[in-house]
Each structure stands twice: as C-alpha cells, then as structure tokens.
Amino acid sequence: GRNMKQNTVVIGLTGQTGAGKSTVGESLLRRGAAWVDADLIAHDVADNEKVCLADLALEFTIDILNVDGTLNRKKLADIVFHDKAKLRRLNEIIFPYIIRAIEAELARLRAEGHHYIVLDAPTLFESGCDRYCDVIISVVADEQLRLQRILGRDGLTHEEAEARIQAQHRESYYVRRSDFVIENNDTVDTLCLKVAEVMSRIETGERPRQQRQAEEAQQEARH
C-alpha cells in the first residue's frame, strides 16, 4: 500500500507591500497548508534567543537591553535607523539565528508530514530563504492600488505610503525569481481563483523556476 510518506512541498510566498499577500496566504491556509512566518520568527529570535541578545549587546552596548535582559526595540531602532552601516551590522548579527530558526521550524513541520508548508517572507530572495522553497509564489499589483491599500491599512501619510511603495521591487524582479506571479488588480474572488489555478499547477508538478534554470544552464553549455 501507500506507506510512502507524501512529499512535502515548501511554497515560498512573497510580493510587494499592499499587493495582497496576506489574502493569498489565507487562501493557502484554507487548503490546509502549514505556516512559517519569517517576520514572526525574526521577532521571536530577537526576543528570546539569549546568545543573539548577548551578541547584540556587545555590538550596540548594554543600552539596548531592558533591566530584565529583554531587548529594548525602541533603543535599538534609534541606533540603527539613521545609520546604514549599523543597520547592516544588526542584520549580519541576527541573520544566522533567524535562518537557523526557520530551518528548525521547516524540519519540524516536515516531520509532522504536512503536504504543503508556506514560508511567508517579505524579503524571501534578499534573505536567501528562497533556497528552502520548492516553488515560489509572488503577489504583485498596480502601484496605485497598492498605494490605496497601504494608506487604508497602515494609517500612513501619503508621503510615507509613497516612500514605502518606492522602496519596493518592481514586478520584473519577482517575475525573474518566482515560479508563479499572481497579479492582484481585481476582486478578492478573482484573486482566489488565481490561487486555485496556481495550486493545481503546483499539484501537477509544474516548476517553472527549475525549468528556466535548466534551460539557462543548457544555453551556457552550448556557448
């Protein structure tokens, strides 16, 4: 009989701010996918990983810790916010801990035998988390729509919202790096239909990214 454990498929989920990533995520959850939230893990690491906190205190002085030894986020933010080099240092220190925690969580969920695990990471590619993913779905939308959505959602001024949009990658960035790009310029119903279509393509084993890489490698070999 089927004593083979069904394969786990890790789905990377990323995209532009305000494009509708969370709606796509909810749709995947309803299909029974397990969930790994990279931002939540990053938060958790900074709060609970004692060795990481010690590393941070060594770099940015003891001022960044509260009396009880927990992280004072406000203090840390004040230090790194206006200083690119310090922000880079912060990321360098905390990064290995986050990656380890994500790896551990993926391993735990694999062992539980989940068919789908969604790795939700706004900076999926920058962080190198794409290497844990069997397939990657990116959610994109027209700039004006994203602007309206984050204005309505995050209580930002128009300037702040504009700045946040400008800091985002263009659609082409995601197209080059993803298996499936979902455009969300329409209703939620349309979006859910697109998710259903993508999921059935994933089910049947479509892996556009791998195919592209294989084709590129072949072309390299020819030259």
Q: Where in this protein do the model-derived segments appear?
A:
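Hydrophobic anchor at the beta1->P-loop junction of P-loop NTPases
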Residues: 13
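P-loop (Walker A) phosphate-binding loop of NTP-binding proteins
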Residues: 16, 28
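Walker A/P-loop
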Residues: 22
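ATP-dependent small-molecule kinase phosphotransfer cores
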Residues: 43-115
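Small-molecule kinase domains that catalyze NTP-dependent phosphoryl transfer to phosphate-bearing small molecules
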Residues: 98, 102, 131-132, 152, ...
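ATP-dependent NMP and nucleoside kinases share a basic, alpha-helical "lid"
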Residues: 103-111, 115-152
